């Protein structure tokens, strides 16, 4: 099945930064997210699905726990990096849109990390993800959800200051933090990659849903789910489907 227009646009954006994306992951892997995933993923299972797998960083974690892992991503260069760097005998990487993922009720685990802010309709995406889960299975989702309505000053700032300068300023702040945490060489490389035109172009295309939107979706699709703040606006969600 071919990609739709929105999916093609997102794929092209990722295609241009695939190597940088993977390198940044090597340099600045979010230990908070990875540590949380290790704590909430089942220790063993049958079939798992990684939606928006990127270069396979989380698929290899699933491969240690599940008999088979399907890992999909919009970007073919990302998939090629995953196959080259993180191939596992029980992981099948393929290019596909999240909304085109098939296997209704087949998966014991469905995982998505920092992918949902690229979908045009959060409710539709979450409903589709729920449909992929087998009875007794678990959904684990991670993404950023700014609470815009609680911060009117932030909305004013966003109106007055264009996104690109704000992203550049954020890279400077992270550089300062990384100097102490990772040393000058690594801090400089992270900063250099973060201010490249292709990377900033990609970041400008991000469209984050609000925390309020997430809460509304969870009330109807994932009643009783667990939500945990993992740092800043990043939220981890777990939900178990009853038998």
Give the ranges of each region predicted by the language model.
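Short catalytic micro-motifs in class I SAM-dependent methyltransferases
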Residues: 114-115
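Short alpha-helix
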Residues: 205-223
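Conserved class I S-adenosyl-L-methionine
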Residues: 1-44, 46-52, 61, 78, 140-174, 178-180
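A conserved beta-strand element that flanks and buttresses the S-adenosyl-L-methionine
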Residues: 111
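A short glycine-rich, Lys/Arg-flanked "PGG" loop and its adjoining helix->strand segment in the class I
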Residues: 124-135
């Amino acid at each position: 099945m071919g990609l739709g227009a929105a999916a093609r646009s997102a794929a092209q954006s990722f295609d241009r930064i695939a190597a940088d994306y993977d390198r940044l992951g090597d340099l600045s892997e979010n230990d908070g997210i990875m540590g949380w995933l290790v704590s909430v993923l089942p220790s063993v299972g049958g079939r798992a699905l990684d939606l928006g797998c990127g270069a396979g960083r989380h698929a290899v974690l699933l491969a240690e726990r599940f008999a088979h892992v399907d890992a999909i991503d919009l970007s073919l260069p990302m998939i090629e990096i995953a196959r080259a760097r993180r191939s596992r005998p029980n992981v099948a990487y393929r290019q596909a849109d999240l909304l085109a993922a098939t296997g209704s009720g087949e998966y014991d685990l469905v995982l998505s990390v920092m992918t949902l802010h690229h979908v045009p309709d959060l409710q539709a995406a979450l409903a589709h993800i729920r449909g992929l889960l087998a009875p007794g299975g678990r959904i684990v989702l991670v993404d950023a959800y700014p609470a815009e309505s609680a911060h009117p000053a932030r909305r004013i700032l966003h109106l007055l200051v264009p996104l690109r300068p704000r992203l550049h300023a954020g890279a400077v702040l992270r550089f300062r933090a990384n100097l102490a945490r990772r040393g000058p060489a690594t801090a400089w490389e992270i900063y250099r990659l973060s201010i490249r035109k292709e990377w900033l172009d990609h970041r400008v295309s991000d469209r984050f849903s609000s925390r309020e939107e997430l809460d509304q979706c969870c009330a109807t699709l994932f009643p009783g789910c667990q939500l945990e703040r993992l740092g800043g606006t990043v939220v981890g969600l777990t939900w178990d489907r009853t038998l």
